[in-house]
Amino acid sequence: ETVPYMFEN
């Protein structure tokens, strides 16, 4: 499971 906010960080 991947989350978008982790990429933006």
Swiss-Prot record:
Entry keyword Ion transport: no
Taking the record's annotation, the residue ranges forming a coiled coil are: none
Which UniProt keywords are given for this protein, alphabetically ordered? Bacterial flagellum, Periplasm
- Give any Gene Ontology cellular component: periplasmic flagellum
Q: Where are the transmembrane segments?
A: none
Tell me the compartments it is located in: Periplasmic flagellum; Periplasm
Q: What does this protein do?
A: Component of the outer layer of the flagella.
State the oligomer form and interacting partners: The flagellum consists of an outer layer composed of two sheath proteins, flaA1 (44 kDa) and flaA2 (35 kDa) around a core that contains three proteins flaB1 (37 kDa), flaB2 (34 kDa) and flaB3 (32 kDa).
Its protein name is Flagellar filament outer layer protein flaA2
Q: Which organism is it from?
A: Brachyspira hyodysenteriae (Treponema hyodysenteriae)
